[in-house]
């Protein structure tokens, strides 16, 4: 019951509360750039996509933590979720600064990622960690692409994305060291397809 309550609390905080970061945002102290309206809309759309990614990360980690019976792994997953909360707050702050909003479909994205996390964790802890590795690697690659898409004048968003990319790579490495199982190619391809649908939709909605 405690695990279920923890997961429910995480869902409510992720979807409906203003997230609070434990660590100072990489954008702190960086002056807002002079953006054209088109650049502002582009930055807002890209940061909305990144915010959705962090919503999904919260769902994935908390679902896996709810299911696993390995208390060491559970604490590892919850710690990763706490670190991802910083990303959630940073991306939300950038959306606010850019005059944009989170995706209206965040509850749907959260539910889908939570379901994937539960299924993966029920297969095995190694499979669960394999999903973490694949997710973090895909997110890292996505963030890398955003570094080339964001307007160079938006130095605050660029700083946030660069730091997030470093953190995601560290999370993937930690999951591999914890015994992650490499996912079969069909599973990785399906995850890439789902990510494509999510990012394309979140860019607009």
Swiss-Prot record:
Gene Ontology BP annotations: ubiquinone biosynthetic process
> What GO CC annotations are associated with the protein?
plasma membrane
Listed binding positions for Fe cation 2 are 84, 136, 168, 171
Name the catalysed reactions.
Answer: a 5-methoxy-2-methyl-3-(all-trans-polyprenyl)benzene-1,4-diol + AH2 + O2 = a 3-demethylubiquinol + A + H2O
InterPro entries named among the record's database cross-references: COQ7_proteobact (IPR047809), Ferritin-like (IPR012347), Ferritin-like_SF (IPR009078), Ubq_synth_Coq7 (IPR011566)
The subcellular localization recorded is:
Cell membrane
What are the record keywords, sorted? Cell membrane, Iron, Membrane, Metal-binding, Monooxygenase, Oxidoreductase, Ubiquinone biosynthesis
Cofactors named for this entry: Fe cation
The record describes how the cofactor is bound as: Binds 2 iron ions per subunit.
Q: What is its pathway? A: Cofactor biosynthesis; ubiquinone biosynthesis
Predominant location of this chain?
membrane
Residues recorded as binding Fe cation 1, renumbered to this chain, are 54, 84, 87, 168
A molecular-function term among this protein's GO annotations: metal ion binding
Q: Which family does it belong to?
A: Belongs to the COQ7 family.
Q: What is the name of this protein?
A: 3-demethoxyubiquinol 3-hydroxylase
Organism from which the protein derives: Delftia acidovorans (strain DSM 14801 / SPH-1)
